[in-house]
Each structure stands twice: as structure tokens, then as C-alpha cells.
Amino acid sequence: MADGVDLPSVSRVARCRQARDFETYVRDTVPLMEMVELYKFEIPLDNSRGLGSAHRIQQMVLPHELFAMLHENYPDVFRKVFATDSLDEWWGHIPAERRQRHPFFDPGRMATTVPLRLYGDDVAIAKTVHCLLLLITSAAAFRLPAGEAYLPVSSTRLEGSDWRTTEEVYKVVRWSLEALCKGKWPATNHLGQPWPPGSERARLGESGADLAGEFIAIIWEICGDWKWLAEAIGFKQQRRYYQCRDICHKCGAQTDGPLSFRGLDYLAACFFQLQSTQSFLQAIDTELSKLPGYDVQDNSRTDVGKASDRRRTDVGVGQTSDIYMYQDTALFDWMHTSALGIELRANGSALMEMATEGRWGRFGGEFKVRYGIALKRAWTDFKTYCSAHGLEQKQPQFTVITLGMAAGAEGLPELKAKARNCMHVTQWLASLTRNDAADPHSRNRSRVLWALASLNDTFLSAGLWLSDDEAATVDRSSRILLGAWTRLRADAAGTKYWGTIPKHHAAMHLLADAVASRRNPASYWCFSGEHIMGVSRRSVAGQYQIGVDNRILASSLVRLGLICKRSALASASSVGSASGSAPGRRL
């Protein structure tokens, strides 16, 4: 009611299951929100068994239409969401040659060119019900609330679908992003067919009008869960993700042999075999691999950054190419790489070792009993630490099961935890072991935990761009992390403790790029995206009917509508009238 919105109406929209009711409900609920007309198209389904329909209608919010609507009707929201006041500064941090190699970048339009990020992940609504969510955000935006930073594009139910289903969705996304790059209303639909005569889309397309005045948006990067990214971009060598031999899209790292990813050293052979743009483009084969900027027609550009030109001479953290590399658009994410990767292994190994050493007491009995008691005491200590430091956490109790040790001493120690909880566990363990120096192994364990906590703290406290001191901290912490982990792994030979995983290799690329570019990895890590996934999951809790994907999209747009309404009311209040908040052209 504080927003002037009838809550029962909001609830009615949240329960909306029928596409035919959606737009009416939303307009009744959020009258100031002139909604973009949902784009409807047909997607194929997996009908190999002859059961059900072979097609269904998919709905989407076209990125270029959402961009145009916000610019015309809600300029304050447009300015905030796309960070238009800081575009000049953002592009100024990108080396000139790198940005100018992007096929759609115009150096004369830096202040009006939005670097766009496409985000994707699947939402598990139930054990057998999953939806693929696609979102867009500005790469120049930083520390915005998740609901404002990430704008909805589509929600696709994955049950009954196959690769053709998502490819059709990506085809529409690619077409819309091309329109954004050009800044003009498209004259035809995604199939190249003319718009229905007399429609607003036909009128705008025929006129060749600008989407958002002088503003355009170019696709600059893609981020999300790596499983989704590998599928969506279509890395041929990573169709089985980390079970295949070639595991990296940026260099020649392999699972074993002379180019093994297990060498935690920037002098490792794989870092001398950097992917060329041409080899990268040849290794991807999906609709998203044809995104604007990927589908290079100019032959002079396909050799940009070839491996022989990018061979490192004085190899070390912070060395990277200054040119725009297509393979660099697929981002490694610190949340998935560290908090849901390296730190799970580090915390699991450290907790089990410290319990074995009697940090929380020594107990008799079988494996599960004695470690269960010690780990429960550790969990109590962790909760006390979080309370004392004002850290919110919902970490389940430490047990041999939550540490992956149900099989006994031969188990693989890996903490089961959500990303934020895992970072808090790392911080606690780093504090607990900071003075450990009884032996080299204890010192190295302390160094690993300190380095991980230091990196997390630096990324959380830094701005969009790292200062020289912050970059030096990242450089130092990364070297300590890699060196100490290598020694811990050698100490643990013959066990599964301190194992090296492909995410160590991903972290090396991520940290090297952060030091070189000064860009804070927190500006593109997936915490906000994961928050949106959680909100979407809760918005359809207990509802597993066919229209669940439409309901997720409806809920996302209602939230955006309320943000726009708040902005309009705030603008009207600041000038003492409602001028400027009136709805504009509807699409």
C-alpha cells in the first residue's frame, strides 16, 4: 500500500497462469507501467515418443523493446539500471584497441553506448520441473539491488524440451540484441517476415526510428552458471563440461598430460597456449555463438589475437591482451569458481584436518561418532563467530555427511554449503588459523584460508575498478593461494584432501584478468543473479502446472513495474507534480 498499489491485485498477478490474462492483470495492477507487448513465437518440443504437442507458444520480453520503453517512459529508471551517467568512465577503463575491435563499438559514442551482459541459469522449481531464465544487465552498473540490475527476458520450461527448443529461444534473443547494437527498430520479425500491417512494430520498423534516442547497447559479455554457458555458447570441447580433455576456452589446459590444468603456476605450459579468436569461433556452434560481435564477417578480424601474437614472455598474474578477444566475453564467475568451488574443498579439508588434530577435542568411538561430536562443536564455534561479527548465515550443522565424509576416512572432504555461507566459513577458519605455525602444513593451510578470505574481502569492499593497492593485494593473495595449495596437495598425496580441480584453473584466469584490467570480479559475480533465481523459485512455490514459466515471467515484470512506479512517484513528488510520470507510447 505504501506504493499506492492494491496488494490483492499484486497477488492476483503473482498467481497468473494464463497468457491471455497476463497483460490485463499487470496493467490493472501497475497502471503507470506501460508494458512492452510480449513477443510470442513457436518453439519445438521433444515429441520423439509421440506424446503431447510437438510445439508450444513461448513468450519473451524483447530486450530492445524493454530498452526503448524504459528510455521513453521511465528515464530515471533507465539512467540507473543502465548506469548511463558512468558510461564514459567505464569505457575509459577499457584499453582503446580492445574496445575498438568490437565490431559494433563506435569511439565517438562512448557516453551513449551501454555494455550489455547476458545472464542465464536454470531454476529448479521442483525435482522434475526446471525453467531456463534469461536476464540482461548493464556491465557498467555496480551494487544495484538485484531486482533493478537484472531485467527479465524469458522463462522457458525445460521439461519436454530438447536442444532445438532453447536454440529457437536464443535465435530470438540474438535478433533482438542485434537491434540493440544498431539502435534501430527492426523492420521484420526474427524470421525475417514483415510485421502485421498497421501494428506499432510495423510503423516503427518502417520509419527506421531510433530505439532510445542516441543510446545503443552492445553485447559485451555473457555470464552465469558454467553448465548453462557451455551449453548455450556451444563449446564443442566442453559438451561434457569438465569430464572432457580440453577444459578451458581461453587456453590449452587439458585434464592430463603436458598441458594439465593441475599446474597451479602461471609458468605452466597451458598458459603459453592461449586460444586464438579464430580457434574460439571455430569451437562454438549455437545460436548464441552468432551474437553480434561473434559472427565476424571481416576476415581481417578473425586473426585478432592469434596464439602466436599472444604468447606470454614475462608470464605472471596481471598479463593479458589489450585487444578485444571474443573468448574473453564468456566470463568466469568468482562466486561459482571460489565460493562454490575452491572454498568448498578448502573448508572441507581444513575442518577434517583440524578435527583430526583435536582442535575441538578428542573423542573415542567409530569414525562417524568421534568426528560428528567434533564437527558439531566446530559448528557451534562458527555460529558464535558469525553472531559476534554480525554475519547472517544459514549454514546447516557440520557433520561427516555435510563434509562429504560419509564413506569414512577415504571420503572426499568437501563442505556442502551455499555460496554466502561458504564465504563466512572461510572467513571464520582464516581467523581461527591465523596464528597456526606448528609445522609447515599448518602454515600453508593458514595461508590458503587467509588468501581466500583476503580475496573475498577485497572484492566486497572495492569499487567497480580496483585501485593499485587493491590490485596488488589480489596479486599477492593469488600467488600465496596457489603456492600454498600446491604444497598442501603434495603433503596430502595418496588422499583426497586438498585436491586440485578445474575451478582452480578458472580462478587463475579470473585473478590474472582482474589484476591486469583492474576490474573488480564482484561487478559480475553471480550473487545478484542467484538472488533472482531464488525469488523466481519462491514466486511459483508449490505450483508445477504447465504455465509455471509464464508465471515466473509475470512475477518478474510486476517487480519491474513496481520499481518503475516508485520511480515515477518519487519524480512527481520531487517536482511537486505528476509531470513526467505519465505513460508514454505503448508497444
Indicate residue ranges for each PLM-predicted region:
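Conserved beta-strand elements of beta-rich interaction domains across eukaryotes
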Residues: 123-125, 139-143, 158, 249, ...
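Well-ordered, non-membrane alpha-helical segments in soluble/globular domains
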Residues: 163-176, 180, 274-281, 368, ...
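Terminal interaction-prone segments of large eukaryotic proteins
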Residues: 1-23, 407-413, 417, 421, ...
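Glycine- and acidic
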Residues: 148-164, 361-368, 408-415, 434-440, ...
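Short, conserved catalytic/metal-binding motifs centered on acidic residues
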Residues: 121, 173, 244, 429, ...
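Charged (Asp/Glu and Lys/Arg) segments that form or flank catalytic channels of large polymer-
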Residues: 11-14, 19-118, 186-431, 435-436
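Compact, glycine/acidic-enriched structural inserts
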Residues: 133-191, 566, 570, 574-576
